[in-house]
Amino acid sequence: MFSCIKGKERTFRNLINGEWINSSSDKFIDIYSPVGNCLVGKVPAMTTDEVDLAIKSAKEAQKVWRDVPVNKRAEILYKAADILIEKVEDIAEIMMREIGKDKKSAESEILRSADYIKFTADTAKNLSGE
């Protein structure tokens, strides 16, 4: 699960401009679980230039996204919600380790998030008359 972000030894990468990358800093930030203080994973410590690039890329992506018709946006959001539902157990497992949530609470939060994404997509379609 999540092989696109996870490398060996629970070392994660950042998604910038559609690509999974490591930081040129070659430094990592260790993430520990509040339960048992065990290592959950490591995330790249990004350089200032990499943070600036991530922000610039997000702004450019927003320009493209705003031109996507509402129906297409809703379709994409529904797909994202469906993926959350499909992967609820895997995501809950990560949440349990990373932030110490119990399984029931983690799964409930994921399912509520999926519902809210769908609600938001439906609201946007109704507001635009599509």
Task: Please provide the spans of the model-predicted regions.
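Glycine-rich loop-to-alpha-helix module at the N-terminal edge of alpha/beta enzyme cores
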Residues: C38-L127
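Terminal low-complexity tails and localization/encapsulation signals of metabolic enzymes
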Residues: M1-K42, E75, L127-E130
